């Protein structure tokens, strides 16, 4: 009798394990599918092509509003004992007017004596004409001018055709918020990792983890966000990461 109970318990545990594992794999597939709607658009070499591309629309959108694309890419590095240095750019591409404006930003975040983070962000307003980003105000710093001139968004060279091949992700899902994420360990042979290393001075040989994180309805929503992040180093006082986002919003919100 005791042996029979043990067998029943083992079988029950086995079914429970399979069920939980199946749920995890199902949620991973849902998260991938949610991101795939946007990531399948990468790469978009000519950003002005986005004027003719429509994102997810729901009943929150005005029928006359064609929406606005928001693009953001940034690289962040922090050595021990130093500030977290961030450089990036954000563009707002209005499909109604077919005009684009935004800014290039440089930030240095360091904790004060009480441990509170203090930002020191500088913004340089820009606009885009004929797929070229140009400053709208005079910039005296030649390095900043060069950085703006040479800047490329990840959406212009990133490629996620192999997204379906990423396996065994660390999955997190909170239906209450709702927020969700999937994290994958990459190798330095990954196409996107190679592209980042070609464009940025990344002071580590460690292969990054890819984090897909978002909020809102997994099946689609005009609210919330979807971000991707390549985390090379994440330690106390030392961080190296690259983040990117491509969002489609109501024009009145931006």
From Swiss-Prot:
It is a lipid-anchor. InterPro entries: Csa, Csa_sf. It comes from the Bacteria. Belongs to the staphylococcal tandem lipoprotein family. The keyword Signal applies. A lipid is attached at residue 23 (S-diacylglycerol cysteine). It is found in: Cell membrane. Residues 1-22 form the signal peptide. One of its GO terms (cellular component) is plasma membrane. The keyword Iron-sulfur does not apply. NCBIfam families: SA_tandem_lipo. Its main location: membrane. This is Uncharacterized lipoprotein SAS0074. A lipid is attached at residue 23 (N-palmitoyl cysteine). Pfam families: DUF576 (PF04507). Gene3D superfamilies: 2.50.20.40. Keywords: Cell membrane, Lipoprotein, Membrane, Palmitate, Signal.
């Amino acid at each position: 009798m005791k042996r029979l109970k043990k067998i029943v318990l083992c079988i029950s545990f086995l079914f429970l394990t399979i069920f939980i594992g199946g749920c995890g794999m199902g949620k991973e597939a849902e998260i991938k599918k949610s991101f795939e709607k946007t990531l399948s658009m990468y790469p978009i070499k000519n950003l002005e092509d986005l004027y003719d591309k429509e994102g997810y629309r729901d009943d929150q959108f005005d029928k006359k509003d064609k929406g606005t694309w928001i693009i953001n890419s940034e690289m962040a590095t922090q050595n021990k004992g130093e500030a977290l240095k961030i450089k990036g750019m954000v563009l707002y591409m209005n499909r109604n007017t077919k005009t684009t404006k935004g800014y290039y930003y440089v930030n240095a975040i360091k904790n004060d004596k009480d441990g509170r983070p203090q930002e020191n962000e500088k913004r340089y307003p820009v606009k885009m004409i004929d797929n070229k980003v140009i400053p709208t105000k005079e910039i005296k710093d030649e390095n900043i001018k060069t950085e703006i001139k040479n800047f490329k968004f990840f959406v212009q060279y990133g490629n996620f055709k192999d997204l379906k091949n990423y396996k065994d992700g660390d999955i997190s899902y909170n239906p209450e918020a709702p927020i969700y994420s999937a994290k994958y360990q990459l190798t330095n042979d990954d196409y996107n990792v190679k592209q980042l290393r070609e464009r940025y001075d990344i002071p580590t040989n460690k292969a990054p983890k890819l984090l897909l994180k978002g909020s809102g309805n997994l099946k689609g929503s005009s609210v919330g966000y979807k971000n991707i992040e390549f985390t090379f180093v994440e330690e106390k006082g030392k961080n190296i990461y690259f983040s990117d986002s491509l969002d489609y919003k109501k024009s009145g919100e931006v």
